C-alpha cells in the first residue's frame, strides 16, 4: 500500500470513528453521579429518560425532569413531559452535549457531570407504568397516555420513581423515589427522596402485587398509612 493510500484509509477510518462517536447511543440503565452530598440519578430506556437531583444527608429534594429523547451529533435532545422547576425556568426542551465510554456517561453542560452505570437488576415489575384507575376493576373509566394528567411509575434496575404531572399545563404535582424489590407477590419501596415531605425519606413501604391481564394490581397502605388499591397499566 502506498503512503497516499495508507493515509487516505487512515483518514476515512478516523472519520468513521468520529461519526460513530457523534451518534453514539446511550446504554439503557440507571446512572448515578454523587458530588459531595448531592446525588444525580438518571433512568434511561430506549427513547425515554428521567433525571432526579436530591441531597442525601440530610435528605432534601431538589428537582426532577423527564421526557422523550433523541441522540444526534453528540447531543442528548430531550422533549420534556415534566419539569419540577418549570414555574421558575419555563423549560420544555433540553439539549445536552454528552459522551459515553466504558459504562460512564458524561453530561457536558455548564457544570459537567460524570455518571457511573449501576448494575443491571432484572425484576418482574420493571418498566414504565401509568396509573389507570382505583381497584377493584369493574369496567370503570381508565386514565392513559391520551390524558394530560398523568402519574408515571418508572421501575428499572432496582430503582423506582413516581411522578405526578400534567403534560398540557406542565403543572408538577410531586415525585418520590429510591430502591425497590418485587418478588413472589411482594413489592417493597425504600424512599430516598420525596418532593412533598423530606421527613418521609428512609421509610420502607410494603405492598402486595399481582399481574393480571397485563395490569399491575397494587394493594397495601400509602405513605399516610391509609388503605389503597391501585391499578397501573404498562406504558407502550
Put a short name on every predicted segment.
Residues 1-27:
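Bacterial Sec-dependent N-terminal signal peptides
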Residues 177-182:
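Beta-propeller blade signature
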Residues 22-73, 77-175, 186-236:
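Lipid interaction determinants
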Amino acid at each position: 500500500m502506498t503512503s497516499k493510500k495508507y493515509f487516505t484509509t487512515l483518514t476515512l477510518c478516523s472519520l468513521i470513528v468520529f461519526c460513530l462517536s457523534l451518534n453514539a447511543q446511550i446504554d439503557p440503565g440507571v446512572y448515578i453521579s454523587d458530588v459531595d452530598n448531592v446525588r444525580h440519578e438518571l433512568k434511561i430506556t430506549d427513547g425515554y429518560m428521567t433525571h432526579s437531583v436530591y441531597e442525601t444527608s440530610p435528605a432534601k429534594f431538589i428537582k426532577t425532569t423527564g421526557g422523550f429523547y433523541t441522540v444526534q451529533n453528540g447531543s442528548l435532545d430531550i422533549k420534556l413531559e415534566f419539569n419540577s422547576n418549570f414555574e421558575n425556568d419555563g423549560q420544555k426542551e433540553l439539549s445536552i452535549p454528552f459522551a459515553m465510554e466504558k459504562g460512564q456517561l458524561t453530561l457536558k453542560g455548564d457544570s459537567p457531570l460524570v455518571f457511573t452505570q449501576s448494575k443491571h437488576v432484572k425484576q418482574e415489575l420493571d418498566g414504565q407504568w401509568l396509573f389507570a384507575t382505583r381497584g377493584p376493576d369493574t369496567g370503570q373509566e381508565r386514565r392513559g397516555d391520551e390524558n394530560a394528567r398523568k402519574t408515571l411509575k418508572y421501575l428499572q434496575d432496582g430503582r423506582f420513581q413516581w411522578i405526578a404531572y400534567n403534560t398540557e399545563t406542565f403543572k408538577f404535582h410531586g415525585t418520590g423515589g429510591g430502591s425497590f424489590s418485587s418478588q413472589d407477590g411482594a413489592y417493597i419501596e425504600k424512599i430516598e427522596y420525596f418532593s412533598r415531605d423530606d421527613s418521609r425519606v428512609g421509610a420502607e413501604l410494603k405492598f402486595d402485587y399481582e399481574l393480571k391481564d397485563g395490569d399491575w394490581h397494587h394493594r397495601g397502605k400509602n405513605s399516610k398509612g391509609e388503605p389503597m388499591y391501585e391499578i397501573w397499566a404498562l406504558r407502550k
